[in-house]
Each structure stands twice: as structure tokens, then as C-alpha cells.
Amino acid sequence: MFRKQSRPGHSPVSLYLDTESEQTPAILSNTLTDVLSTVPETSEIVIVCIGTDRSTGDSLGPLTGTLLAKNKLDNFKIYGTLASPVHAVNLEEVLADIELRYTSPYIIAVDACLGRVKNVGSLHFEDGPVYPGAAMKKNLPPVGQVHITGIVNVGGMMEFFVLQNTRLHVVMQMAESLSESFVLADRRLQGKKLIKKAYQDRPVPIGGKTVKHEA
């Protein structure tokens, strides 16, 4: 169902997940929670969902963003929906806006990609940025401290035609799995924050006096 590689002292380098597995949202949300728990509290976590609804295969990003926007998320800011997509034309402008709007933003990029036949329908979480438009030989800025790509179809030739003729069912299944993963991760991150706050606010008896615990 998945392949995971890691380095000592680092978050997972490579994680492949099959979106047909019911375990995928739980596994991916655990990975996201572990990685994002190390992000400074002063940083805003921004999910940039890249793509366009003008191409079925390239609609994974905006579909995911639209599903996420329907949820009340405490720890994530969302860019890229069906109504307001992030694509090749406005990508640099969106990234500039994020840098101006947020202090030390931590970006998670979500994008569709093409790959091997055996991996179609898989999600791939990886450290480092994604390079949007690589399959179409576009020269666009890299996006994200980490990224998640969904392998929507087979690559190698006639990429534009392949993206246009990708099954919507495959893309929608990925978007739903991604959305569920982020929602679960958001709840877990919020739970950790509440536990930490409760611990810090807990009165501690010291020398006959009760004082608040200081982390």
C-alpha cells in the first residue's frame, strides 16, 4: 500500500499511498502531524493547491482546495480552489502575496503529476518543493517546504493530451483522500495545542504556594 523512506533525525523523505486504501487518510494525517509539529508556532501553515479545472488531470489541486475550504480549519490557510485556482499564470503573484501576508509561512504544495502505470492513483508525500508544470516543460518557481503529488495518469509522452483525458473519478478519489487527511491532521494539531496549553496553565504547588507551570 505504501513505501516509506526516512533519514535519522528527519521527517519522512518519501511516502507513497494508495488512495483506494481506507488507511491512507490516517497514515498521511499522522505523517503530516509529525512533520508539522516541528514547525515554529510563529509560522503560518499554508496549503497551496496548484492546478486548473480546465484540465481534468490537472484539477486535483483546486478540487482538494475546494473540499478543504468547506471545513473550518484551525491550523491551515488554503490557496487554490475551483473558484480561485492557483496555476501557471498567477503562481508567482500568489507566492508573493503569501510571503507578504504571513510571517515565515510554511508551505505545503499539492499538485497533480504523471507517473508509472503501477503508481497511478497514488499519493506521494515528500520533503522539499514541487516543481509545477514540469511534465509540460514549464519554467515555474518551486513551491513548498514539503509537497504532496497525486499521480493521476501515465507520463512519458503527449502529456497535455494525457492530462485532458484523465478520468475524473481517479482525481476526485485523490482529492477526497487528501482533504480527509488534512482535516484529520488539523484536528490532531489542534488537540496537541490544547493539551500543551492545559499543561502550561496547570497550577503547580511550590513551597506551599500554587503557581502556574512555565514551559
Task: Describe the predicted segments one by one.
Residues 1-107, 112-215:
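N-terminal catalytic or cofactor-binding beta/alpha core of small enzyme domains
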